[in-house]
């Protein structure tokens, strides 16, 4: 093993001092910060907010200090349809409602996984994986589908935000504290030879405590409610005693089984045109497992464009923090110039970044437009974010096509856009990925 001796370090000093451009960059960075100093003018010139296909200008939502982007993105796709179908000025579905039931279901999911792994040592990788994060705010498309199909949706006015839904750190801290304690209770009970009936009774007692905790933090979700609205023609409408499930059927009405998750993961362990699932990834026990079809990036973008051309927005997952400017909303591979300013070249490709833990899906948003050239090839993409209207262009972001290539990992599209061969591959027995695989990352 090689140590760092002082002679070597002195050479580094000398090399730095012999490079005036680095010293100029030092002066700029020390006063303005790293990214602000390296931001390029060209990225703003290349990525204006004009698109040949532009589906919506509806006001954006705001997930605030929570990790609910996957829910917001899904509910936003429904919201645009609902606003159009029912002639509304603006409208939001309750993200807190979906949040409550996700926490409830994830708690049960975690306890079931603890029971299933009770024969493993406490230090085993799978048990440690479970205990490291019993639950969190993030999720996947198939997980939110499971929630909508079981619990429906409600208007935001019926089940509004609470402090704990908008800023979820404390809720997560103490829910995970409770779940780790519950895990010990169940493992100790099983170690003593308890019957499955005894374990189930204990688990139900623990779930009552969890339910109480969630209700105190978020409020009790309504079992039925009244809904009234006035449309753009000033016509008054009213529904009484409607359930969340009935509200979904009437006001959203999408058949969610018609949609599939498509990924682009160009690593050698994931051949294209095959389906994948992830071990230990889920929320609703008994719901279909998370499933993806892996395709090449050109095909990935063709599918997204096909759905946008059909007038429907696209839920997608990406690594949003890479080469992006939160304030301007520009996501482009030339947003920052590390080469000219520092002499550093980031040259890992997409597969390398996945393999070496440099990148994974971190955030879900909605594609609501695309700018196509004369040959129908994408130049840039319109993105609806859920960070409020004080960033980007009133909350909308723009992604260059090269940024999409490098940092986008998942889209959700209708099955009708797949070829018969692709649909058969999606429906085939999926390869099971390890729980810690980057494709198991939650948006």
What are these regions (language model features)?
Residues 2-58:
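N-terminal regions that are enriched for targeting/export leaders
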Residues 2-22, 72-75, 88, 405-406, ...:
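Bimodal feature
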Residues 44-314, 391-394, 401, 409:
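Active-site nucleophile-adjacent alpha helix/oxyanion-hole segment immediately C-terminal to the catalytic cysteine
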Residues 69, 148, 355-388:
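Catalytic nucleophile-His microenvironment captured as a short glycine-rich beta-strand/loop
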Residues 72, 316-319, 368:
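Short His-Asn-centered micro-motif
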Residues 287-362:
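Long, positively charged binding patches that form subdomain-scale interaction surfaces
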Residues 320-326, 330-348, 371-374, 381-391, ...:
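Active/binding-pocket-proximal capping segment
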Residues 373-443:
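Conserved catalytic-core surface of thiol
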């Amino acid at each position: 093993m090689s140590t760092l001796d002082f002679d070597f370090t002195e050479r580094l000093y000398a090399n730095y001092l012999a490079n005036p451009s680095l010293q100029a960059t030092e002066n700029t960075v020390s006063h303005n910060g790293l990214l602000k100093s390296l931001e390029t003018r060209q990225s703003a010139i290349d990525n204006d907010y004009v698109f040949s296909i532009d589906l919506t200008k509806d006001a954006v939502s705001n997930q605030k200090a929570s990790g609910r982007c996957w829910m917001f993105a899904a509910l936003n796709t429904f919201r645009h349809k609902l606003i159009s179908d029912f002639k509304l000025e603006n409208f939001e579905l309750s993200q807190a409602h979906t949040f409550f039931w996700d926490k409830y279901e994830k708690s049960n999911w975690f306890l079931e996984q603890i029971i299933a792994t009770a024969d493993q040592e406490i230090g085993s990788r799978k048990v440690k994986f479970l205990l490291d994060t019993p639950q969190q705010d993030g999720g996947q498309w198939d997980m939110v589908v499971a929630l909508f199909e079981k619990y429906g949706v409600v208007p935001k006015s019926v089940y509004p935000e609470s402090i704990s839904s908008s800023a979820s750190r404390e809720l997560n801290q103490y829910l995970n504290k409770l779940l780790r304690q519950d895990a010990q209770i169940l493992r100790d009970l099983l170690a003593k030879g308890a019957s499955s009936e005894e374990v189930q009774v204990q688990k139900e007692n623990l779930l009552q405590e969890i339910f109480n905790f969630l209700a105190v933090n978020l409020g009790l979700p309504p079992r039925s409610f009244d809904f009234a609205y006035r449309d753009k023609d000033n016509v008054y409408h009213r529904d009484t005693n409607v359930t969340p499930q009935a509200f979904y059927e009437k006001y959203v009405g999408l058949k969610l089984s018609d949609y599939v998750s498509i990924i682009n993961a160009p690593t050698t362990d994931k051949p294209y045109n095959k389906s994948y699932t992830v071990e230990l990834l889920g929320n609703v026990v008994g719901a279909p497992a998370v499933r993806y079809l892996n395709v090449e990036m050109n095909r990935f973008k063709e599918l997204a464009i096909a759905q946008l051309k059909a007038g429907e927005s696209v839920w997608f997952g990406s690594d949003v923090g890479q080469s992006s400017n939160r304030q301007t909303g520009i996501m482009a591979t030339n947003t920052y110039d590390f080469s000219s300013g520092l002499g550093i070249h980031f040259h890992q490709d997409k597969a390398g970044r996945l393999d070496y833990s440099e990148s994974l899906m971190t955030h879900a948003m909605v594609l609501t437009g695309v700018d196509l050239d004369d040959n129908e090839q994408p130049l840039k993409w319109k993105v609806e974010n859920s960070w409020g209207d004080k960033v980007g262009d009133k909350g909308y972001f723009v992604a260059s096509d090269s940024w999409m290539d490098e940092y986008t990992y998942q889209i959700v599209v209708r099955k009708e856009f797949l070829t018969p061969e692709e649909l058969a591959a999606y429906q085939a027995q999926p390869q099971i990925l390890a729980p810690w695989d980057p494709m198991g990352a939650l948006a």
